[in-house]
Amino acid sequence: MAGKSFMTPAIMLAMLLLISPETYAGHDYRDALRKSILFFEGQRSGKLPPDQRLKWRRDSALRDGSSAGVDLTGGYYDAGDNVKFGFPMAFTTTMMSWSVIDFGKTMGPELENAVKAIKWGTDYLMKATQIPDVVFVQVGDAYSDHNCWERPEDMDTLRTVYKIDKDHSGSEVAGETAAALAAASIVFEKRDPVYSKMLLDRATRVFAFAQKYRGAYSDSLYQAVCPFYCDFNGYEDELLWGAAWLHKASKKRVYREFIVKNQVILRAGDTIHEFGWDNKHAGINVLVSKMVLMGKAEYFQSFKQNADEFICSLLPGISHPQVQYSQGGLLVKSGGSNMQHVTSLSFLLLTYSNYLSHANKVVPCGEFTASPALLRQVAKRQVDYILGDNPMKMSYMVGYGSRFPQKIHHRGSSVPSVVDHPDRIGCKDGSRYFFSNNPNPNLLIGAVVGGPNITDDFPDSRPYFQLTEPTTYINAPLLGLLGYFSAHY
C-alpha cells in the first residue's frame, strides 16, 4: 500500500481516520454499551433469572448434562444456533472479564450488568470443570442442530455431552477455561472474595490438567468440534494465555517462570498478529507487556517487542500490513465473520494505548511512531463504523440507531417467541421463518452481526450467515471499547 503512494504512511493513516463519505453525527456510546451487554441475556441457556430483561426468551435446555450424570445447565449459546461450545464460551468470558478489569470504572451503571454477564459464564464453566482432570467442552450435536431451525425453548435435537480427560486431551479448551476463570477471579476479588477464590482455585487445577495432558481437542474430539470450532492454531498459545492470566490473578512466581521457560517451546513468537477465540498470541503479548511498560518485568521484554510489531501491523500505510482496510475504513481480515476481528483487534489497540499512556511511551513503526492517541483513534474509527459511520449508513448493532440489521441469522430471534406462539415449532417447521423476507419478530438487542467485508456491502438476509450471524465473542471485547469511549467522548 505504501509503495503505491507518494504520501507517507502517517499521512495515509490520518486520511483513513479522518476522511469518511460524509460528516457523521456523534454516537451514544453509553446506549450502545447498555445494549451490547443486554445481548448476552438473549444468548442465555438454562433457567432464566427473575431479572431477565429480554422477555421474549424463556427457559431452555434444562436437562443439559443429564445423559452424563452431571448438571450442565446454563451458559451461553455461542451464536445463532443452540449448541453450547465451551471453547468460544470460555474466550467470551475471558474477554468480558478483561473489559471489566481494564475499563470497568468507565462503564457507570452498566458495570453491574457486565459483571452479571461474566458470572453467567463462570457459573457454567465451574459446572463444566467440577470433576478433576475432566472438562466438559460441548453440549449439543452441531450437525443435528444446524439441520433444524427452531428456537431454544423447543429444541429436541441431540444434547450429546462431550468431554476432555486424561485419555482425550484438549489443552486449548482447558487452557482457555483456566484463563477465563482466572480473569474472572480478578473481577470478583473485591465484590465476592469467596467466589473469587473458588474461581482461582479451579483455574489453577484446570491449568495443571491442561499442561499435564497436552494435546488438541481438535484431534481427540474431531468429529464433534470440527469444522465448527476446530483449533487450527494449536494448543500452545492457550497454555501461555492461561499462565499469563493465572500470573496476573495470583502473582505466583511459578506462572512467570512457566511463561519465560516455555515461550520458545510454545511458539510465543508465532502468528503474533492474530487474536480471537482460536489464536491468543497477540493478546498474550499485549497482556504481558503491561508489566514491562511498568518497569517490573524485563524478562518479558520479547513479548513487548512482539506487541509493538503487532500494533504496527494494524496501521494502514505500513509496508507489510496484516490486515486490509475497506474503502469505508473497516478493518478486514480473512477467516469467519469479520466483526470478530474488528472488535478483538480494536480492543487490543485501545488496551495497549492505555498501557503506553501510563508509561509515557510510543510504538516505533519504521519511519514513524504511533502514539497512544493514534491507537485510540484507530480503535474508535472501527467502533464508529460498527455504529453507523459506514457507506451503508447503518448500524451493525441490532437496536442501535435508526437503521440496523432486521433479518439476522439467529434461530431464537427469527422464530416467533413462546410468548406470542406458545405451540411448539418443530425442527423443519421453522424453515419458513429462515427463508422469510420479513424482519425477525424478536429484537436481539445489542447483537453485533458478522458485518460486511472488503466491499463494505451488506446483504441483510439470514442465509448469509457469515455476514448476518451475531456471536458472543464479537460482543465481548466491545464492552471494554464502549465503556472507554462512553466516558471519554
UniProtKB/Swiss-Prot annotation:
GO terms for cellular component: extracellular region. SUPFAM superfamilies: Six-hairpin glycosidases (SSF48208). It is found in: Secreted. Keywords: Carbohydrate metabolism, Cell wall biogenesis/degradation, Cellulose degradation, Glycoprotein, Glycosidase, Hydrolase, Polysaccharide degradation, Secreted, Signal. It catalyses: Endohydrolysis of (1->4)-beta-D-glucosidic linkages in cellulose, lichenin and cereal beta-D-glucans. It comes from the Eukaryota. The keyword Secreted applies. Glycans are attached at N453. Its main location: secreted. InterPro entries: 6-hairpin_glycosidase_sf (IPR008928), 6hp_glycosidase-like_sf (IPR012341), Glyco_hydro_9 (IPR001701), Glyco_hydro_9_Asp/Glu_AS (IPR033126), Glyco_hydro_9_His_AS (IPR018221). Its EC number is 3.2.1.4. The keyword Nucleus does not apply. GO terms for biological process: cell wall organization; cellulose catabolic process. Residues 1-25 form the signal peptide. GO terms for molecular function: cellulase activity. PROSITE patterns: GH9_1 (PS60032), GH9_2 (PS00592), GH9_3 (PS00698). It holds the Pfam family Glyco_hydro_9. The active site is at D81 (nucleophile), H409, D460, E469. Belongs to the glycosyl hydrolase 9 (cellulase E) family. PANTHER family: ENDO-1,4-BETA-GLUCANASE. This is Endoglucanase 4. It comes from Arabidopsis thaliana. The lineage of its organism: Eukaryota, Viridiplantae, Streptophyta, Embryophyta, Tracheophyta.
